[in-house]
Amino acid sequence: MGDIVIELFPNHAPKTVANFVELATGAKEWVDPNIGEKVKTNLYDGTIFHRVIPNFMIQGGDPLGSGMGGPGYNFADEFHGELNFDKPYLLAMANAGPNTNGSQFFITVAATAWLNRKHSIFGEVKDAASQKVVDAIAVAKTGANDKPVQAIKISKVSFK
């Protein structure tokens, strides 16, 4: 569908940004749930956006592709007073409750104030071309559990 360029917020969410970058580059060890072993490889390349909800968000970062996978560890939430879900195109950690961040993330496509202080915001999709890609993913046809009928794959995560 195209590239999604994201500006990360290391000054506002340093641990969350570090976790994302280290998982994306293979610098951090994680447990691959597909094989049950510790690995030190890029987690995100080849994964899919496994959950898409129009007018809300697109979610990825699960090595299983089901919404049930992660890196085999959790880390604490990071909230910053300057970061709120008051606009679309924010990058945040998906979780299963307080301090359960792992590898799954989502990008909003609308203001989602009810998520404030529940999910760590650590980046933003700022350019119009990238926002169009996010919007296109957000309206993909979905089936059970909001999973796109046709896989939408993350081919490569890279950093400048």
Language-model-derived ranges and their functions:
Residues 1-160:
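Cyclophilin-like peptidyl-prolyl cis-trans isomerases
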